[in-house]
A protein has these predicted regions:
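N-terminal glycine-rich FAD/FM-binding segment characteristic of electron-transfer flavoproteins
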Residues: 52
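Residues at structural and domain junctions
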Residues: 2, 18, 74-78
């Protein structure tokens, strides 16, 4: 499990993006952000909701729906978004700092 790995979301359509620092990998939970289908009616807010392409589809990072899940729910990653670190961190900063 690594920060910015993407996992299938068994609860709803879309994925979960792991945003927790790898330093805390000993915990039995992970902080995640849902990645929702861009055609699902969710209107992205600039800076808060970047859009990523995963498995040929476009998915919105629903930063305001940040949650914690048991690590055991996250199986094999289907994608890695480490190359989008700046966009992801900017969205988290927008949520917590307002900029």
């Amino acid at each position: 499990m690594a920060r910015f790995d993407v996992y299938r979301n068994s609860a709803i359509e879309g994925f979960l993006l792991d945003v927790q620092a790898d330093l805390l990998s000993h915990l039995n939970t992970r902080v995640v952000v849902p990645l929702l289908p861009s055609d699902g009616g969710f209107q992205p807010a600039r800076g808060l909701n970047p859009v990523f392409e995963i498995e040929g589809g476009r998915f919105v990072m629903a930063t305001q729906f940040l949650a914690t899940v048991p690590s055991s729910l996250l199986k094999a990653p289907v994608a890695r978004l480490g190359a989008s670190r700046t966009e992801i961190t900017t969205a988290l900063d927008m949520l917590f700092q307002g900029f």
